Amino acid sequence: ETTQQRRRLHENLRGTEKKPLPYLLGMMNLVLHGVGQPGIVRGNSLAKPITQISRSERVDVVLTNPPFGGEEEKSVQENFPVQLRTAETAWLFLQSVMARIERSPHGRCGIVVPNSVLFDTGVGGKIKAELMSKFNLHTVLRLPNGVFAPYTIIPSNVLFFEKGKQGPVWFYELPAPDGRKNYTKTKPMRFEEFADCAAWWGGRQRTSRVENERAWRVEPDPIRQSGYNLDLHNPHRPDDLEHRSPKELVAELIDTERELLKLYEDLQREIAGFAL
C-alpha cells in the first residue's frame, strides 16, 4: 500500500450515524487510525427516499453493522417502494445499501443481519428476491451466539454480496471456541477466531473454496424455490438432538437460561452506567 493509495482511501471513507455516542466514538476511532478528516455525518441513513439517492451518495463498497430489532416510523417507511415497505430496520438498511452500490460495476457489501432476515417471507422474501436478481449473494457467514452481547443476544449473520449474476451461495458456520456457548462483554469474540474462515475464503476472487464440516454451497434455484429461505442446516453437521437424552437436553436448557440471565444482568449494569 502506497502513501497515495492510503490518502485516496482516507479521502473516500464515508459514513452516517444517527446516535451521538456511536458517532463520537466512530470519529475518534478514525482519527486515531490516521484519518485526519473523517467523512462521517450525523443523521439517519434511511431519511431520504432511495429513489433520490444522488450520485455523490453512491459508493463502491459498504461495510455495515446496522441496528436491528427496532422499528422505523411510517414517514421513514414511505421512503421505500410500496411493495417493500416494512417497519423492521434490518430490511430497510439492506434496501438502502443495495440502492447505494447498485450502479457501481464493482459494488460490493458486507452487512450484519439478524437470523430473521434469513428465514423471513412476505416482504422479506421479496427483498431477498430483489437482492439475488440484482446482485450475487456469494457468502452467508453464520456467527456464533452472543457475538454482540450484552447489547443484543439475537443470533447474527453477515451477508456478502456484489454486483453481478447470482451464482452458488456459500455458507460458512463460524463455531464458538471449545467450551464456550456464548460470548460476553468481558470475553468478546477475538479477531484470531476468523483465521480458519479467512484461510478458506480464497482471497479476493474466492478461489479454491471447498466444502468441509463448516462450509457448504447451495445453488440459487433451490433457494428461489424455497421462497428465498437462507436459514439452512449444515449438511455436514448431524443433528445430535436425536441422540441425546431428555435429561441432557433439559440440563443444557438450564445452562443456556443461566447464561442469558447473566447477559441481561450485564446489560442492566451497562444501562445503569450510562444513566450516571
Residue locations for each model-derived region?
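Conserved SAM-binding motif I beta-strand of class I
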Residues: L13-E17
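Conserved SAM-binding loop of SAM-dependent methyltransferases across substrates and taxa
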Residues: E1-Q5
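Extended, gly/pro-poor, charged amphipathic helical "stalk/hinge" elements that serve as dimerization
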Residues: R7-E11
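S-adenosyl-L-methionine
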Residues: K18-S56
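A conserved structural/catalytic subdomain of Rossmann-like adenosyl-cofactor enzymes
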Residues: R42, A47-P49, S54-L276
